[in-house]
């Protein structure tokens, strides 16, 4: 779900566009990974974007607020982030969260939150929380925190 600009798709942002910013950094004590979706001011967002953003945010909050016992796997938690989208017949094609390393890779396992995440989560494991929704050719939304 990472956009790659090409000569054919390269253009200036316009009022009413949604701009998805995926950023992070590596520091002595760890790695960061954050994504935000912002509206370029001047026009209303694309049709359906407010509802989709709200559903993504609800899923993000549900996962962030979850309290669960040691041994719960990522597949069990994945449903919390997807449920608001599923209620509207929507979904996203990527995992909800990935392990995060320090000095190695921002995407590091074995822990992950996804439809296939079978590794039991344990204290000390860092996993991202990044549900999204992508309306092909229209807009994309993702909210990510660690």
PLM feature spans:
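Active-site neighborhoods and metal-handling regions in enzymes and metal-associated proteins
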Residues: 1-146
């Amino acid at each position: 779900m990472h956009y790659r600009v090409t000569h054919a798709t390269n253009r200036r942002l316009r009022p009413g566009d949604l701009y998805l910013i995926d950023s992070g950094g590596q520091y002595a004590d760890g790695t960061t990974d954050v994504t935000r979706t912002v509206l370029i001011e001047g026009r209303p967002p694309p049709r359906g974007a407010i509802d989709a953003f709200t559903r993504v945010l609800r899923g993000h909050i549900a996962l962030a607020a979850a309290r669960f016992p040691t041994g719960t796997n990522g597949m069990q938690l994945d449903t919390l982030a997807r449920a608001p989208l599923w209620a509207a017949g929507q979904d996203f094609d990527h995992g909800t969260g990935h392990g995060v390393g320090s000095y190695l890779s921002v995407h590091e396992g074995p822990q992950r939150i996804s439809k296939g995440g079978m590794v039991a989560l344990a204290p000390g494991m860092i996993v991202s929380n990044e549900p999204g929704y992508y309306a092909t050719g229209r807009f994309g939304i993702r909210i990510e925190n660690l």
